């Protein structure tokens, strides 16, 4: 459906073995694809092909190799095939499409199965995000720090009480 509508898709997985399974299926169906893992020799070439080709395609990326420093604005869909324990890594993956020059609305999907390990990881991610918001948010811990508190934190160990 997405291909027929002219959409390009990024598929992220933390497991290269899962990307291989998806790649084999897409190749069996003669679907255009690009592939990027830590073992990819021509990273720039794969990215350029995906960005410039007119034919809608799928870009399979490992979370670690494709999660940072890439600009993939020709995609309009992002699929996170399996969750990563650190929500920032997933956010970085989704952000590959949210760059200057993005002309499409971007839709991100996280694939989860009810009552699975992945669902529990997603719950832990949510708790981790809440903790960060509670500590660093507008009404969190850091907003109530005064100059004396900051001096204590930054200079701790310099005093004689040590």
Residues of each region from the PLM?
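ASCE P-loop NTPase motor core, strongest for the SF2 helicase catalytic module
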Residues: 1-162
């Amino acid at each position: 459906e997405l291909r027929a509508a002219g959409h390009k898709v990024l598929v992220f997985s933390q497991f290269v073995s899962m990307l291989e399974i998806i790649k084999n299926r897409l190749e069996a169906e003669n679907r255009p694809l690009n592939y990027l893992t830590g073992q990819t020799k021509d990273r720039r070439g794969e990215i350029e092909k995906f960005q410039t080709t007119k034919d809608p395609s799928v870009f399979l990326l490992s979370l670690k190799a494709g999660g940072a420093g890439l600009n993939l604005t020709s995609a309009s869909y992002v699929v996170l095939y399996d969750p990563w324990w650190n929500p920032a890594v997933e956010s970085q993956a989704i952000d590959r499409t949210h760059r200057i020059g993005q002309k499409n609305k971007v839709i991100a999907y996280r694939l989860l199965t009810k009552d699975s390990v992945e669902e529990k990881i997603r719950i832990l991610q949510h708790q981790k995000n809440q903790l960060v918001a509670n500590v660093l948010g507008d009404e969190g811990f850091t907003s109530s720090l005064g100059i004396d508190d900051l001096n204590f934190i930054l200079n701790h160990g310099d005093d004689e009480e040590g």
